[in-house]
Amino acid sequence: MITRIDYCNSVLYGLSVITLAPLQRVLHAAVRLVANLGYRDLLTPAMKELHWLSIAYRIKSKLCHIMHAAVNNRSPAYITDTLVPASCLLHRERLRSHESGGFEVPRVWTEFGRRAFSIAGPTVWNELPHNIRTTDNVTTSQ
């Protein structure tokens, strides 16, 4: 079941911390409610105990889940068609890092363009360690 705070949060990738602050405050209020904390109590230990991520990490996690589905052929064609594996690059353009199951990140000139899934997905995916990228199990990659 997708929680309301996670619904469509991958479209929020690339937004500033200031823009995400109201959503983060909602998450903090939920932690205080669930963990029965006061206003001055620390939230980080409670979030770790609840296994909750901050909004920025939730967004990256959602992108990684979508990319994992695309890599393992469990996503729609409109998602997989936007991704270019690094192995498709010309031989002279290949780097050692591209041999490890990464994706080509197309060149983009605007900040708005960096938020597109065809850019954000491969960027987040290529930042993951190799052992997480190559796993077939979603729960292992979490």
Question: At which residue positions do the language-model features occur?
Answer:
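Hydrophobic/basic alpha-helical segments
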Residues: M1-Q142
